[in-house]
Amino acid sequence: FINCSYPKTDEWAELTFKTSNLTNFKTNVDLHLLSYIWISNLFAQQMVRKNTDGSIILTSSIYGTIPQKQNLYEGTNLSENIAYPVIKAGINQHCKQMASFYGKNNIRVNTVSPGGLEGKIAGKELQQDKIFKEKYISRTPMKRMCKPSDLVQIYLFLSSNDSSYITGQDFIVDGGFSLT
């Protein structure tokens, strides 16, 4: 089971340090984080009921581990989002909690944390801001953004029996960005 749900409100972009409000923050954290917790837990419970072992993979982000780099957003049409790293850090910790609880049922739980992905902005037809992309690439040792194809093999590996003794881990796929 791969959980990559991404529910958010229309006010998601307003969740900056300067423009957020408590209601918007709480609503988005509830939608996004609870979708991961609830759906993954329901799936794990079903696996236990059916006596099925396997893998649950939660899609997180490097921003669940490192802070957003403010200078990447300067001069762009993007801004930091104060809810996003809170949500992703919560997903990472939930992974560890689930792994420790469901390990006895031979259910593995891991996260995949991509760096900046090449392509359209999540849930929108807009392409990424060119200045943001240039700044991001300049900080990345591999000098490019993550492509969806860069993620396929880690998801396949974690879904397979080749990872039968791996649980509670966060797999960062960011071309070295988090090292800088």
Model-derived segments and spans:
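Conserved NAD(P)H cofactor-binding loop of Rossmann-fold oxidoreductase domains
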Residues: C4-W12, G176
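Catalytic loop of short-chain dehydrogenase/reductase
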Residues: Y6-T9, K18-N24, V48, I57-G90, ...
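A short, exposed helix-loop element centered on a Lys and neighboring polar residues
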Residues: S40-N41, K96
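A glycine/serine/threonine-rich, flexible loop-to-helix segment
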Residues: L15, K69-E74, K104, P114-T140
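A conserved structural motif in NAD(P)-dependent oxidoreductases
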Residues: T140-L151, D162
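Short, small/polar-rich loop/turn modules that mediate ligand/substrate recognition or access, typified
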Residues: G103, R108, I166-G168
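Short C-terminal tail/terminal secondary-structure segment
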Residues: L156, T167-T180
